[in-house]
Amino acid sequence: MRIFFWKAAVAAVAGLGAAVQAQPFYLPTANHALFVKGGEPDFFAPTPGKTWESGCFGCVRTDRHQMHEGLDIKCLQRDSRGEPTDPVMAAAAGVVEYINDRPALSNYGRYMVLGHNIGGVEVYSLYAHLHSVRSDLKAGVSVQAGEPIAVMGRTSNTAETISQERAHVHFELNLFYSDHFAAWFKTHFPGERNDHGVWNGENLVGFDPRLVFLEERAEGTNFNLTTWLQHRVELCRVLVRKTNAPWVKRYPMLVAQNPTAQKEGVAGYEISLDYNGLPFAWVPRAASEIKGALKYRLLSVNEAEETLNPCRNMVKQVSGRWQLAPNGISLLDLLTE
């Protein structure tokens, strides 16, 4: 069973009381050009030959067919050799969950994951392409919001290295899919290595930090992460005949009440997925509310959203009818196994 280090973080800062629950996210570097009108080119590090949008979160690469699950934030400081020296800071109070100190094992290069409790929501921030991680940090160590945790770099294991000009920190905000990831990975990627256990990026589902930062700045202390997550745009809705989904216990704030299922018992769930595969709304269903015997059934597709953000390939059209694509089925397996 995985130890939830983020719970230790909550205890460590319990003296802050309600302030912990209202803790906003902070930008992970001193680059605050995101908050300057027209400052996006100074904030986002684009891919070679592309505009700043390619450094954003979303279907922003390869003509909208490749997902980029974070923000690439430009460096501000360099040493005499032109290498980045920007401190990377914790985006919120939390606990170190994982450090990969072997850049060759991931296209993230050297990266680390912090766990946070934001108003009761279990959130994980990820910082990648790091030059170095603070030497005293290891899994289980608490950090405060804005505390330096690493130095920006350009580490990676990809064939095309990150140039000095493009030096950046890749930053993500994520929810956590499943403690059963290792078994799922072995089934769906036979023969492939998983060097990072549950902290493999495939087991973290991102939401757009840019939108969070901007809305948080606009709303101040009125910003509520749960409400924000509950109002994601639906790409598709599916019905699953499974009742043991770990997500339901980890994120109960995203599960609706259904009197019929409460009375008769839960036989499955109706799940709303955004375009990145984040299951932001779950409705328990009783057996009397479920038609057919299929394990998974696609209920609806938001065609406008699928056209705008097709990069996850979770659904497909066959002879004019929408179906779950292999990627969509694989995701549902991860959520419900």
Task: Identify the role of each PLM range.
Residues R78, I99-R102, S132, R154-T158:
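Short beta-turn/strand-loop junction motif enriched in small, turn-promoting residues
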Residues E83-T85, A91-R134, Q164-H168:
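Zn2+-dependent peptidoglycan hydrolase active-site motif and core
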Residues A22-R110, D195-E337:
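Surface-exposed, glycine-biased beta-strand/turn segments
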Residues M1-A9:
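Bacterial N-terminal signal peptides that target proteins for export
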